[in-house]
Amino acid sequence: HANGSLTLGENIADHGGLLVAHQAYLNSLKGKETPAPIDGFTNEQRFFLGYATLWGQNIRPEEIRRRTKIDPHSLGKWRVNAALRNIAPFYAAFDIKEGDPMFMAPADRVVIW
């Protein structure tokens, strides 16, 4: 189990960093044509897929246990899923609706800034 007290600061940083990065990405597109989909994914979907790819991990159970005890960062899976589930643009990009595995009710989503 994750230690929320240990990872709280980094979880907040991941959330804020993702919001800022997404806004910077949108700002970079202003005045430009919308890029064509690649492999069936829109530019905004590719932004979120890139974020998810950044934190991909393949680690052994004993390393998971070790990191959970000492690392102030959540494991990659949770850095991705927890951050994405809390921001509205992710829902819009992938048309996520109630009943989908990544859905979280708007009232339950973290809003810090």
What positions do the PLM features span?
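Zinc-dependent metallohydrolase catalytic domains
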Residues: 1-113
